């Protein structure tokens, strides 16, 4: 009988530990769809390792800890960004930002968009080149840390948004399509204070197939 009781107690304890782990690990660090050195020389292996493995991991860990016991415990990232504020918003925004950021690149990227996204860009800016210039100018002119995004509204209309710190177009009811990170940790090892050079170089590694599917 004693052995049976101890076994039941152990099972309950293990179950509680498992449940706790599941809560803590609601959001996980995304796996990169390429090797850490695959985007060189545009983005170095060292930057990828720190940016993805350290910075993003910290945002994910913080978010998991912050949402425990709140109404956001079972929400999606998009729901959290749309409805939260303060520390939860900041860490959810940065998790969403970086998930979209890292998965929009490919060592075989570059070129230009095609299909519906290409037509929408041409209709809005006149040409892909005009869009690129305005997008880079927006990122260059953003004061301090943040993001520049290509986003669309519910009718498919495109716009360029400048998001301070960890914000995301989702917070304004828009869908993020393409995002460039202008926090210094995203580019300082390679480009120092040359933010425009960093932004212009990123076009060489954009996976337009992935980005186009977001539209």
Which residues does each predicted region cover?
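Sec-dependent signal peptide recognition
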Residues: 1-6
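Short, Lys/Arg-enriched N-terminal segments with co-localized hydrophobic residues
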Residues: 7-24
